[in-house]
C-alpha cells in the first residue's frame, strides 16, 4: 500500500524539500519499496499491509 508513514503517536513523519533520501530510508526500513518527501511529510510506496499509515479520519496531530 502507499501512504504517509506515521510515528508512534499517529503523526506523519515530517520532512522538508531536499530530504528525499531520508524519507526513502525511513520507508524502506518499514519494508516499503521506496519513498520521498511530499512536503510536509514522507510518502511511501509499496508498504506491507501491517504498516500503519496516516488516516485523515483520525487526526491526532
UniProtKB/Swiss-Prot annotation:
Gene Ontology CC annotations of this record: extracellular region
Q: Which UniProt keywords apply?
A: Antibiotic, Antimicrobial, Disulfide bond, Ion channel impairing toxin, Neurotoxin, Secreted, Toxin, Voltage-gated sodium channel impairing toxin
Which residues are connected by disulfide bridges in this protein? 11-61, 15-37, 23-42, 27-44
Tissue specificity statement from the Swiss-Prot or TrEMBL entry = Expressed by the venom gland.
Q: What is its main location?
A: secreted
Q: Which Pfam families match?
A: Toxin_3 (PF00537)
Keyword ATP-binding listed? The answer is no
Q: Name one GO molecular function term.
A: sodium channel inhibitor activity
Q: Which GO terms describe its biological process?
A: defense response to bacterium
Q: What CDD domains does the database record attribute to this sequence?
A: neurotoxins_LC_scorpion
The UniProt entry, under InterPro entries, shows:
LCN-type_CS_alpha_beta_dom (IPR044062), Scorpion_toxin-like (IPR003614), Scorpion_toxin-like_sf (IPR036574), Scorpion_toxinL (IPR018218), Scorpion_toxinL/defensin (IPR002061)
Q: Where in the cell is it found?
A: Secreted
Residue ranges of domain LCN-type CS-alpha/beta in the record: 1-61
Role of this protein:
Shows antibacterial activity against both Gram-positive bacteria (B.subtilis, M.luteus, E.faecalis) and Gram-negative bacteria (P.aeruginosa, Y.enterocolitica, A.calcoaceticus). Modifies membrane sodium permeability on Y.enterocolitica. Is toxic to cockroaches and crabs, but is not toxic to mice. Does not induce haemolysis in human erythrocytes. Acts by inhibiting the sodium (Nav) currents.
**How are the domains described in the entry?**
Has the structural arrangement of an alpha-helix connected to antiparallel beta-sheets by disulfide bonds (CS-alpha/beta).
Instruction: Give the family, as the similarity comment puts it.
Output: Belongs to the long (4 C-C) scorpion toxin superfamily. Sodium channel inhibitor family. Beta subfamily.
Q: What is this protein called?
A: Bactridin-1
